[in-house]
């Protein structure tokens, strides 16, 4: 009889020691996985938590409640999350989520899990199936005073939640209206890790969804229209393409004026083309790969597909904010188009929706946009995208080391002419009245491939919108230029340089 009580005293001492430091040490959690067969893991047991020395470790539980029937989803270890700090019991407070989630600190604290609605409804406690009595069970029934302290902690946490919505985990709640097709992300805990970018409508977080990294774009409530527009574009039939950003889910977090709107997409560690070009000089083949996949993505976005892979009609879509910051790069430098908050669909027999003229990023605005002289037809909007593509292609060439000459530090289009923060009036003067474009360096024209690519760039940013190339034509040209240059030997490079037209490029005639 002495040994169990000695062990009990030792465990109580360790709990008190953790409490004295302001945290309960978590080293082991109850483990359970409802999808153990599919994921090829154990169904249940104990899980030993591992993490960085300066990070706190927690346990978590997630479950569903279908008409009073409790269906356990997962239990296990949860890494450092301020929402779990000093919580000795696993308590979920959401009103009616798809999946309940709770986390706590302390060994095996997720054995029991509780739902305590914020609205003050009745507390509902869910217990696992009866098992053989354990030391932890004896401890749970012995330390009743801890329950009172836990209720005080829960009250403080409830007040904190009402002050600011937490970022520790996510359960998906769709805004009223038809939800976009997406997997049940709410079945899997999602944890925000770090801010990767800040933009016009909010910030982008790197987050962890089980074993995968994802990107979470968070919009404030006042930018609901942009969030809703981008969600609708992602939900358009046929938007699954290797050169378009992969959509995972959309979510509304929080309540009333403190609500936030989330878009969850694939995460690409190399970031945007802008960021990559700032820190890297690229080779000829890398330039061609980025340019070809980027133009392929825009070509597909612009395309009208009557019946796309059985999903239905994919309408033509104009991006309207095409720039290097909105082109992401996969690990192999394959380009992926992102940020469809200003995009507009062109469906037969329907108005295109919000088509205000001067939208997008000033630096990348076509002359007709800067002038406010837009023809509000589909082709006009697609040609505006093509002007911006010409500028992005110029950015690629400016950081390519293929030519025999210096590679300058990365600069945005027109940064050399009018600086980093040009006004609308300055751009109108330079782009519209003086018809200037970013400078094409002389030594670029001495490389056969870059020389041909510069011709394509000039035909993309042509002042006459109707003379601009289509994205599909750019894709064909880049592919042809790459093959022609890579197929030549050093002995015949000179002859190619003397006449750019040695390679028959696809016709300039626009197919938009």
Curated annotation (Swiss-Prot):
Per the record, what are the reactions this protein catalyses? L-threonyl-[receptor-protein] + ATP = O-phospho-L-threonyl-[receptor-protein] + ADP + H(+); L-seryl-[receptor-protein] + ATP = O-phospho-L-seryl-[receptor-protein] + ADP + H(+)
**Does the keyword Iron feature in the UniProt annotation?**
no
GO terms (BP aspect): activin receptor signaling pathway; cellular response to growth factor stimulus; pattern specification process
Q: Does the keyword Disulfide bond apply?
A: yes
Which residues form each disulfide bond in the chain?
A: 29-59, 49-77, 84-103, 90-102, 104-109
Protein's UniProt name: Activin receptor type-2B
Q: Which gene encodes it?
A: ACVR2B
Membrane-side (Extracellular) residue stretches = 19-137
Organism of this sequence: Bos taurus
